[in-house]
Amino acid sequence: MDTMDTMGRHVIAELWDCDFDKLNDMPYIEQLFVDAALRAGAEVREVAFHKFAPQGVSGVVIISESHLTIHSFPEHGYASIDVYTCGDRIDPNVAAEYIAEGLNAKTRESIELPRGTGSFEIKQRETKAL
């Protein structure tokens, strides 16, 4: 590949012991994800979120550089998030950490995968208990 080592960076995060009300609040999650994208320096293109009954939210923020997604399970205090950024200008960990803080996640586990390089190699794995 020409000037980049990868086509992109993909952070997959497991967030546990999150605030129930925040995990179930679609407007809050939508704004949190837009703010996370902007904080990381991304350009927001489109936003789509859905509130499930009786609880839970799924959504995506499309950015010029790729996307941020969430699937929340308030009854378990759990959220599954992905932050994928193309190129090397934006650090997806900035957005992922902002989201974890915003959901008051007490336990976090994440991996970062380089995309577009062929075989997968896990570059980062961390668990934080607060």
Curated annotation (Swiss-Prot):
It is an enzyme of class 4 (lyase). Pathway: Amine and polyamine biosynthesis; S-adenosylmethioninamine biosynthesis; S-adenosylmethioninamine from S-adenosyl-L-methionine: step 1/1. One of its GO terms (cellular component) is cytosol. SUPFAM superfamilies: S-adenosylmethionine decarboxylase. It comes from the Bacteria. GO terms for biological process: spermidine biosynthetic process. The modification Pyruvic acid (Ser) is found at S66. The record marks E65, S66 as: Cleavage (non-hydrolytic). Signal peptide: none annotated. Binds 1 pyruvoyl group covalently per subunit. It holds the Pfam family AdoMet_dc. GO terms for molecular function: adenosylmethionine decarboxylase activity. Its EC number is 4.1.1.50. Keywords: Autocatalytic cleavage, Decarboxylase, Lyase, Polyamine biosynthesis, Pyruvate, S-adenosyl-L-methionine, Schiff base, Spermidine biosynthesis, Zymogen. It catalyses: S-adenosyl-L-methionine + H(+) = S-adenosyl 3-(methylsulfanyl)propylamine + CO2. The active site is at S66 (schiff-base intermediate with substrate), H71 (proton acceptor), C86 (proton donor). Its cofactor is pyruvate. Is synthesized initially as an inactive proenzyme. Formation of the active enzyme involves a self-maturation process in which the active site pyruvoyl group is generated from an internal serine residue via an autocatalytic post-translational modification. Two non-identical subunits are generated from the proenzyme in this reaction, and the pyruvate is formed at the N-terminus of the alpha chain, which is derived from the carboxyl end of the proenzyme. Heterotetramer of two alpha and two beta chains arranged as a dimer of alpha/beta heterodimers. HAMAP family: AdoMetDC_1. Belongs to the prokaryotic AdoMetDC family. Type 1 subfamily. Catalyzes the decarboxylation of S-adenosylmethionine to S-adenosylmethioninamine (dcAdoMet), the propylamine donor required for the synthesis of the polyamines spermine and spermidine from the diamine putrescine. This is S-adenosylmethionine decarboxylase proenzyme 1. The gene is speH1.
